[in-house]
């Protein structure tokens, strides 16, 4: 069983987040009561990971945990085997006492594209929607954020996050909750909200943008990253079935169309700050994620297209302000 008591105590002391306590404990109790086939196995492995008190933690330039006195080889091998129990590792990379967790995604590259364009995170409270295993939350703390709350319904992502947090010494500035955005009340409590890699999974993208706006304080900043296509403000791709072998994908606007959508739901100061074609060096199969990845999803004869014939993945970052 997971104990979220620390988070409840934290938000009880925050006047903006206190109202969340009206619904959150029951939601997390319901989540605990739902069965997941592998969760018990993962939890046993998590409980075997040692409580960390590392001598060095670098979350400014990477996510790296190390000690002045290295682990014995046997201890390292045991730790690596425990961490490999949580395969596949999709978001990272992490370096833990010399163990390099080479994840499917180079999430640090995305962070390097996003960071120059956002308001400084120092002393801000942050919500990361669809946070994966929390890699970017650690980087947000590295930029001085006061509190990072991530939401993602994946059981495995929660386990991976808690494993890294345990090895870090139990840092209570970051918390991952196994929820979807639709389960959050209108909190209007966060200074910055991130939604990266989520919008194309939503059947109603405008509703998603409104849900994000509902979590921001007045004057707060949205950082939105999603798959886009090239084109003018009227260009939108709606795949008929899969896109790059992904199910449950719906709307791929152009960056210009997405800017219009953000303005339509009431955001101001909307800027397209980055567009980038995803490379096979940024998303690929690794020793820590052995399933198919981007190289398998592109047309082998024309890598500018997916295997379904759509334009290859292109991602845009937009920033916007809530009035």
From Swiss-Prot:
Keywords assigned by UniProt, alphabetized: Transferase, tRNA processing
GO MF annotation list: methyltransferase activity; transferase activity, transferring alkyl or aryl (other than methyl) groups
One GO-annotated biological process of the protein: tRNA wobble uridine modification
Regions annotated as coiled coil: none
Catalytic activity: carboxy-S-adenosyl-L-methionine + 5-hydroxyuridine(34) in tRNA = 5-carboxymethoxyuridine(34) in tRNA + S-adenosyl-L-homocysteine + H(+)
Enzyme class, spelled out: transferase
InterPro entries per the UniProt record, alphabetical: CmoB, Mo5U34_MeTrfas-like, SAM-dependent_MTases_sf
EC number: 2.5.1.-
Protein residues bound to carboxy-S-adenosyl-L-methionine: 91, 105, 110, 130, 152-154, 181-182, 196, 200, 315
Annotated Pfam families: Methyltransf_9
Entries under SUPFAM superfamilies matching the protein: S-adenosyl-L-methionine-dependent methyltransferases
Subunit details: Homotetramer.
Job description of the protein: Catalyzes carboxymethyl transfer from carboxy-S-adenosyl-L-methionine (Cx-SAM) to 5-hydroxyuridine (ho5U) to form 5-carboxymethoxyuridine (cmo5U) at position 34 in tRNAs.
Family from the record: Belongs to the class I-like SAM-binding methyltransferase superfamily. CmoB family.
Protein name: tRNA U34 carboxymethyltransferase
Gene for this chain: cmoB
